[in-house]
Amino acid sequence: MKKIYFIAGEASGDFAGGRIIRNLKADKELKIIGIGGRNMEEAGNFESLFPISEINLMGFFEVIPHIFRIKKLINKTVEDIIDNKPDILITIDSPGFTYRVAAKVRERLPELKMIHIVAPSVWAYKEGRAAKYAKIYNCLFALLPFEPPYFTKVGLDCRYIGHPIMEQEFYSDKVALRQELEIDEDTKVLCVTLGSRKGEILRHLPIFIPAIEKVYDDHKKKLMVIFPLANPDHERIIKPFLEKVRFNYIFSYERLKSYAVSDLALAKSGTNTLEIAASGTPMIVAYKVNIFSFIIIRLLIKIKYVTLINIIGNREIIPEFIQFNCEANLISDKLKELLLNPQEVDKQITESHKILQELGFKSNIYPSYLATKIIRQEFLK
C-alpha cells in the first residue's frame, strides 16, 4: 500500500488537503499520515502528529519567542517522516515551516518524491526563493495563473491548478439566510473576521471593537455583528473584549453563511477576502503586524497592495487600512460611508467579481481534482 505524508499548517491548507486526500482515496487504497487539521484527519483517517495551531504563526518578530519550540517541531516532523518512509511528501503552504522540513528531509531521503501546494509569493518579495524551491521539490502547484513562469524558468515543474475557493459552494439567498438567523430585514449586518491565529485576534480586537462601536452609534439597534470563527477556542479569547460593548453580536461556525448574510464586512487580510467577495459582500480590509515585522516587510516587499483582488487588479478595488492606517476612526468612517453609499458598494462588488472570474470563479476549474489527477498519474504509478 502506498503511503503519503501530508503537512498543512493552517486552516486554508487543511481545507485543500482534506479535499485532495478524499479524492485520492476514492479509487485507491492509501495510507495517509502527517500533520493537518480536522478536515485532513477525517479524510485520511489519521491523527495529526501535533495540532496545526502549534505552527500557525505569522510575522518575523512574532515567531521569535517560539523559535526553539518551532525548531523542535521541525526536527520532530523530519524524524517522523524518516521513520515512516513515505512514497510521497506533500506540503501545503506555511512555507516558514514546510520548506525547512522538506529541505532537511531532502538531505536524508534524496530520492523521495516531494510536492508543494501553494506557490510562495515570489512575485511579491524574495524572488530568489524560486530557485531554492527548485532544489528541494519535484513539483509545485500554483493557485494563481501568473505564477508558474517564476518557477519554470529556474527548472521547477510548476502547474497551475486554480484557487481552492473556486470549488466551494457559496450562498446567494440572503433573504432566506436572514430568516434562518432571525435577523430583521432592516437590520444592517456587519461581518468581522479576525484571523485564525491568536496573535492576529489579540492585535486586531482593540482596534476593531471601537470602530464597530462608532458605526453602532449611527445605527443603534439596527446593527448586528457576526464573528465567524474556525476554532471554538477563539470564542473564549474574544468574549472578554465584548463584555461591555453596546452592539448586538453572534458567533458563527459557518463562515460562508456569515459572509453571505452580511451587508458589509470588516476583514483581516487573507484568503477570507476572496470568500467574502465570492459571497457578493462588500468589505474593507484592515491588518496590523508587529512594527519590526512591518519594517522588514516594507523593505522586502515590492507590491502596493495586500489584498489579492487589489494586487491582481493593480488598483484599490477594496479599501485597505494597513498598519499605521489600521486605526479605529479611519475604519469606522469608511464602514459608515459604504453603508450609506450603494453606488460605491455596487462598484466594488462588480469589479471584485471580474477579478474572481480571472481566477476561474464559477468555471470548470476544480483545483483539488487537478491536483489529484497529477499526483495519481505522475507520482503514484
UniProtKB/Swiss-Prot annotation:
GO cellular component: membrane
Keyword Magnesium among UniProt keywords: no
Pathway, per record: Bacterial outer membrane biogenesis; LPS lipid A biosynthesis
Catalytic activity: a lipid X + a UDP-2-N,3-O-bis[(3R)-3-hydroxyacyl]-alpha-D-glucosamine = a lipid A disaccharide + UDP + H(+)
InterPro entries for the chain: Glyco_trans_19
Keyword terms: Glycosyltransferase, Lipid A biosynthesis, Lipid biosynthesis, Lipid metabolism, Transferase
One Gene Ontology term from the biological process aspect of the record: lipid A biosynthetic process
One annotated GO molecular function: lipid-A-disaccharide synthase activity
Domain of life: Bacteria
Pfam families: LpxB
Enzyme class: transferase
EC number: 2.4.1.182
Role: Condensation of UDP-2,3-diacylglucosamine and 2,3-diacylglucosamine-1-phosphate to form lipid A disaccharide, a precursor of lipid A, a phosphorylated glycolipid that anchors the lipopolysaccharide to the outer membrane of the cell.
Family to which the UniProt record says this protein belongs: Belongs to the LpxB family.
Designated name of the protein: Lipid-A-disaccharide synthase
Gene (UniProt): lpxB
